[in-house]
Amino acid sequence: MADRQTPYKYFVPRKMASWVTELEDILWPDNKIVEKIKKRAAGFANAGIDTAINYGFHLRFDFSDYFETLHGYYKNVCDELHKYGIKFMDHYSCNLIERPRTKEDFFYLHNAHRHHVLLHKDPIAAKFAQYEGYFFQDICEKRVNDGTRGYSWNYQAEMFCHNNPKFLDMHKKYLERLFKDVPMDGMEIDDMCDYGAFSTCCCDYCKDRFQREFGRELPNFEDKEFWGDTSGNPTTWGNYNNPAFRDWVQLKVNSVSDHIKMVKSILGDRPLMTCCSATGPMHLNGLALNLERFMDNLDLVMLENCGMSVHTVEWGKMEAEALIQKNIALNMGKAPAIALSYSTYDTSAYMGWSFARFWGVSNWASTLIGRLSHNPGDIKEIHELLAPSNNWEDRYSPLDTDKGEDIYEVRLVNNLLCRENGYRDEEGREHWTKVSAWSKVFIRTNVGYRFLRYTELADAKRLMSEDTPIILDNCGCVSDEQYTAIKVYLENGGKVIMALPFGIKDGKGFIREKPLSEELIEANYPGLVLIDNNIVDECCVAQLIEKGIIKPRIHQVEGETTWAVRIRKHEDKLVMHILNRAIEAIPHSTLTGAMHTGNILKDIKATNNGDKVSYIIDINGIADKWDNLSFMSPEIGSIKRGVVVENLGHNKVKVTIDPKNIMLYGIVM
């Protein structure tokens, strides 16, 4: 599977917002609903939103009795938004139906997932629920332990099987009807995964596919050589030392991937994305969430970068996922990457907008008011929360994020093969554990970096196309193709920073007779640098900088070191983004999240002093000069603060910025 070179060809969503629906909207064409559509569409236009995305009526087949009315509502929404040049994308879950099985589940569902818009069948009616002649209970996944219908504890839902041809035909017919009824501009199909994790599915279609594709029989649940320890969450089940189980992991991904391919065949000239908002950790194997295997049939990439809780201030934890998704989008013909942020109050909406600007991606502002402990009575509509940031951007700092070029000094490898084969080192650490640790330390040291994924790692020409060093940390699984490319890169003077183990298993997860690292070390390549395999911190990076192995373009010389700094090139212009790491959450006094996520974020405060900061920037090769700069932020409106610029010679420029009273974000341009 190769990365895509064909350029992205659809509309580019830059300022997205959720079109939040409520149960009363199913009463369309009631005059109240029609007027509400008109009012909100005008609000979206005034907020500078270019793309609205449906948010509600989510578990779509729970509304199969009301599709005519629902589609009439959506057509009305499309028509009204199109008057303002705003695109409208649908967004729904295709393979879940809400079926709470106990009173506790029932009340939990109605407390934690009200934003779905809930109208599920009662237990008696559920037996007869169907669409296009397909009874829902006949197309559900089956539990591997007893053959009963699978169940998602996260969503109190039953799940349709991605391999069941009746479900696939039902979904296909629904999509054809939807596009006939509604002039949708694009689509996000959610839950293209398996929320039963490894507890499902043992239906005949899945077992037959396992036999056809891998020549294997699915073992009984009692076979611990295959299923491993099943006492924990089903995402943790499975014995990765068994190649048959590793094939089962791939089977689950293949099943979802083929479903996505079918959906794409129906969409025609419309972009498709799915909810695959994380890429790195191994537990995603159980959920069959694997964007790198899905990307061939997707057009847009969504990254779910933050929520509404007080923990949102710890934004550095989210960056690794955000930037690897951005790299995937870049290798889908430079498709837009979209950062989804959930907001309750003005500050969290501003934070989501700021994160998107800092990462150089499109912003999707949304909310999860259906997951709040109660209605505080002061909740704004999402376009009202988003308008100040969008309008400031349009007026003072318009940037096409999809055209920006990231400036970086290091390539950080995240090798999908490690995750897929269940690799852990002797300390039990995943490859992703070390990768995400590098991401965090690069934020703290202002080293520019990008991700290098498994496909690029197997391509010597792409490795040699840049002179930035490559970091390989805890990369236990390495394919023969990847190893060959790495050797060619080193033989041609490339630099590799390596923390062992490396290549103790092959690309399919089988143990090698001898780790590949031994051959590399014996070859004594000048560009191979071995580092401690336990420590990823500022001291480690400082040593690599001191030795000239990493050559950062940004070097702070004065002021507090609490600002994260990124440089991006827009056409012939350099832009510097700064984002505060020293922020503290101000929680709402009573409002909490329903899924044990803690207090809702009400506001933030900066814990640094806001003193002037100075950086020496190496502009060699990226700009002839960098001067006449201003510092701006939505927090100071139309004011442009002067930036002191000193030309130090040798393509180095010293810039001094005054971030006084800036809580979160600013830009130098």
Can you annotate each of these PLM segments?
Residues 1-99, 108-110, 169, 406, ...:
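Mature N-terminal, pre-catalytic/accessory segment of carbohydrate-active enzymes
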Residues 2-7, 55-58, 99-103, 190, ...:
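Hydrophobic targeting/anchoring helices
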Residues 17-32, 55-71, 152-172, 239-257, ...:
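The substrate-binding groove and active-site-proximal loops of carbohydrate-active enzymes
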Residues 19, 89-94, 188-191, 228, ...:
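Aromatic-lined carbohydrate-recognition surfaces of secreted/lumenal glycan-active proteins
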Residues 26-44, 167-178, 283-294, 348-353:
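Short, acidic/polar
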Residues 28, 90-182, 225, 234-249:
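Active-site-adjacent "subsite" loops/lids of carbohydrate-active enzymes
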Residues 32-60, 181-184, 298-301, 352, ...:
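Catalytic domains of carbohydrate-active enzymes, especially glycoside hydrolases
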Residues 347-349, 461-462, 473-668:
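A conserved amphipathic helix/loop scaffold
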